[in-house]
Design a protein with these regions (language model features):
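Start-transfer (signal-anchor) and selected internal transmembrane alpha helices
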Residues: 1-27, 114, 206, 279-293, ...
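Perimembrane helix-loop-helix junctions
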Residues: 8-9, 158-159, 185-211, 282-283
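Membrane-embedded helix bundles of polyisoprenyl
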Residues: 18-21, 93-110, 115-153, 165-173
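Membrane-lumen/periplasm interface segments of specific transmembrane helices
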Residues: 32, 203-279, 298-302
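Extracytoplasmic catalytic/substrate-binding loops of multi-pass membrane glycan-assembly enzymes
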Residues: 32-46, 52-75, 86
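Loop-to-helix entry region of an early transmembrane alpha helix in multi-pass inner-membrane enzymes
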Residues: 66, 70-73, 82-101
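Hydrophobic, aromatic-rich transmembrane alpha-helices
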Residues: 99-111, 194-195, 264-292, 296, ...
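Membrane-interface alpha helices of multi-pass inner-membrane proteins
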Residues: 131, 164-180, 186-191, 213
Length: 348
């Protein structure tokens, strides 16, 4: 009975801390009047379509930016319509809720003592929260979903719980419908899971078939509503005609901006340092090896995304690299936590 009461008391503390942070962030979001640039021109306008009872059919007429997925804008409109006053910012509170839930999920079982988990939960919010991410931009949704998926991937590796594959697929499908680059994150996770040594070939085949069916389904829906699959400035002719000087110039600046924003984000930077620190453990397929594959593919994606884009490189890096690094870091936060807690346990 004592242990039961203690367990319920800990759960109550968890709920109280969660809603205290949610209230603080909600007040902060409500006190800000500015939306992010992409939010003003893309995501908020799309949310208005849904808010005014329009559908994806009408949204396909928004030719200025019809190709970006619409799920984040739908959440914005849906939760706005559920609120009492239906102010614009109330829809964005769902972003904060998902963000807090995702951090709670990865911190709930790091330590045996619940109080330590709550301290860690509070610390991570303090480190990662910035209003800019909640100004209508979609990267916080990607970050949050990647946190949840990373937890599912860890449990799949550690405990061989193949039921997690279904939930991973649901997470990847959501990511596909939030931003265009969601396909890159989904493919990275797809490749990494197929490296898992403890999953049967049959399960991997089923996972792969369903994964590609989800991508095909998205393409078919876009075709049906006559929406461009992608309208980003990537052209085969431009890629084939890149000269060596421009390639070197772009790679140099990508490296500089990636390093700078990794230091600002710190999660991405620490991941790179830990992978180097654990390099001797990469000879066999273990959790460190899987994170290494994930991180390398992530770096390749970032470099390719900017290298082959027909846009002024400095402007492109200044306006987007910070958000790319932030959303990507959702893949690695749990890895960092596990690294330090496992080392602490090994000393005793």
């Amino acid at each position: 009975k004592i242990s039961f009461v203690k367990h319920k008391f800990n759960e109550l503390n968890e709920i109280i801390i969660f809603f205290i942070f949610f209230l603080i962030i909600a007040v902060h979001i409500a006190s800000k009047l500015n939306l992010g640039w992409d939010a003003k021109w893309f995501w908020y306008i799309k949310s208005l379509f849904y808010y005014q009872n329009q559908t994806i059919n009408e949204l396909s007429n928004y030719t200025f930016n019809d190709f970006h997925p619409h799920l984040g804008s739908y959440f914005w409109a849906f939760f706005r319509s559920l609120s009492i006053n239906e102010y614009e910012y109330t829809g964005r509170l769902f972003y904060a809720f998902l963000y807090l839930i995702s951090i709670l999920i990865i911190t709930s079982n790091i330590f045996k003592k619940k109080i330590n988990n709550l301290i860690l939960f509070s610390l991570l919010i303090t480190i990662t929260y910035r209003y800019d991410y909640f100004s209508g931009l979609q990267e916080v949704l990607i970050f949050s979903l990647l946190l949840v998926v990373s937890k599912l991937m860890y449990d799949l590796y550690e405990f061989k719980n193949t039921k997690n594959i279904l939930f991973i697929l649901l997470g990847l499908n959501s990511i596909l419908w939030i931003k265009s680059e969601g396909i890159a994150y989904a493919l990275i996770i797809f490749v990494v899971i197929n490296f898992y040594p403890k999953i049967k070939i049959k399960s991997k085949i089923i996972f792969s078939i369903i994964f590609f069916l989800l991508i095909i389904l998205k393409i078919l829906i876009y075709k049906y509503y006559q929406i461009k699959i992608n309208d980003q400035p990537y052209y085969l002719n431009y890629i084939l005609n890149l000269d060596l000087n421009l390639i070197i110039y772009k790679i140099k600046n990508i490296f500089i901006f990636l390093t700078y924003n990794s230091l600002k984000n710190i999660i991405f930077f620490i991941t790179g340092i830990l992978i180097i620190f654990n390099f001797n453990q990469l000879k066999k397929i273990n959790y460190n090896f899987l994170i290494f594959i994930c991180f390398i593919l992530n770096i390749i994606f970032i470099f390719c995304a900017y290298l082959f884009r027909d846009m002024e490189i400095i402007y492109s890096l200044k306006t987007t690299m910070d958000r790319i690094v932030f959303s990507s870091s959702g893949l690695y936060l749990l890895y960092i936590l596990k690294f330090f807690t496992d080392r602490k346990k090994s000393k005793f």
